[in-house]
């Protein structure tokens, strides 16, 4: 009987170890592929148009963030650096275990259509606290001409009258 219990224990331990390895591998998996939007088939002209990248070159900015957010990742149209305009915003709520850095290509896609996109590395955005902190961070960027002793390219260029929020999986709950 002891031998059977020992064997069952070893089998359970092996299963748990394999599941742990599988979860680690999944969390390290590559994200959305760069050309994801070219592989989607659609029957509509409007969908086809907006599946393609927009006309604007995209730039990237990041800044360290507190707690589990790790960093604020901001994708924006490069013209923002030289133009005196305001730009609409998309705030991202990540799904469970999914960091913003795994979805770069979709954020670059949105920015190519002239949106500022902000996300974090938070992996549990069910309560939208990360989204709230993104808005606070954008307000800081919008209201300060100089940040960390450098000219701030986002100064007075964020359109807070046109802010959208997106999320997938658990991040969808944060959107609500």
Task: Enumerate the predicted regions with their spans.
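N-terminal Sec-pathway targeting helices
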Residues: 1-17
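Hydrophobic alpha-helical membrane-insertion segments, chiefly the h-region
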Residues: 16-28
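N-terminal cap/lid segment of alpha/beta-hydrolase-fold proteins
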Residues: 29-85
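Extracytoplasmic/secreted proteins, especially bacterial periplasmic and envelope-associated proteins
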Residues: 73, 88, 105, 112, ...
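Solvent-exposed loop/turn segments at secondary-structure junctions
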Residues: 80, 95-99, 117, 122-127, ...
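Gly/Ser-rich "nucleophile elbow"/oxyanion-hole loop immediately N-terminal to the catalytic nucleophile
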Residues: 81-85, 129-173
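Short beta-strand element of the alpha/beta-hydrolase
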Residues: 84-95
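Short amphipathic alpha-helix adjacent to the substrate-entry channel of hydrolases
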Residues: 101-120
């Amino acid at each position: 009987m002891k031998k059977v219990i020992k064997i069952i224990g070893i089998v359970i331990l092996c299963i748990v170890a394999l599941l742990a390895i599988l979860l680690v591998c999944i969390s390290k998996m590559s994200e959305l592929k760069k050309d994801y939007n070219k592989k989607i088939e659609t029957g509509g002209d409007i969908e086809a148009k907006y599946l393609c990248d927009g006309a604007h070159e995209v730039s990237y900015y990041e800044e360290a963030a507190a707690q589990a957010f790790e960093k604020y990742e901001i994708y924006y149209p490069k013209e923002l650096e030289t133009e005196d305009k305001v730009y609409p915003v998309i705030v991202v709520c990540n799904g469970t275990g999914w960091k913003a850095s795994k979805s770069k290509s979709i954020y670059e896609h949105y920015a190519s259509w002239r949106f500022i996109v902000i996300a974090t590395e938070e992996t549990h955005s069910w309560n939208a606290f990360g989204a709230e902190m993104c808005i606070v961070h954008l307000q800081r960027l919008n209201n300060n001409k100089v940040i960390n002793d450098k000219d701030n390219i986002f100064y007075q260029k964020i359109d807070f009258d046109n802010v959208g929020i997106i999320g997938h999986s658990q991040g969808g709950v944060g959107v609500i």
